[in-house]
Swiss-Prot record:
Pfam families: Com_YlbF
HAMAP family, per database record: UPF0342
Protein name as annotated: UPF0342 protein LSEI_1724
Family that this chain belongs to: Belongs to the UPF0342 family.
């Protein structure tokens, strides 16, 4: 019987060698060189984290919180290193979605009676 955890750890190592991952890492490294862009990125991540925490606790967001996050997102859209990072995230996300479909297929097969 295969040890799925060993397989998962190998997959994690293999992901690091993909072009999608390497492109993301390079884009992030370039973003960090732009102190203004990186600062906005960190602010956005922090606000996003805070809102996720509120959501998990069943709390509603204030209009000001939503507006603040949207304004920060709008600022970020105009910054090339952030746009580049987002594009590379999208490429990696597509690969991860495909991998998730493959990994989930046995469960789907059970429910479809295969």
């Amino acid at each position: 019987m295969a040890n799925v955890y060993d397989t998962a750890n190998q997959m994690a190592a293999d992901i690091k060698t993909t072009q999608e991952f390497q492109d993301l890492k390079k884009a992030f490294d370039l973003l960090k060189l732009d102190t203004v862009a990186y600062g906005l990125f960190q602010q956005f991540q922090q606000k996003q984290y805070e809102m996720q925490q509120k959501s998990m606790q069943g709390q509603d967001f204030t209009d000001d919180e939503v507006k603040s996050l949207q304004e920060l997102g709008d600022k970020m859209r105009g910054i090339q290193p952030i746009q580049n990072l987002m594009a590379k995230e999208q490429g990696l996300s597509q690969m991860m979605d495909e991998l998730n479909k493959i990994i989930s297929q046995p469960i789907i097969d059970v429910y479809q009676g295969k």
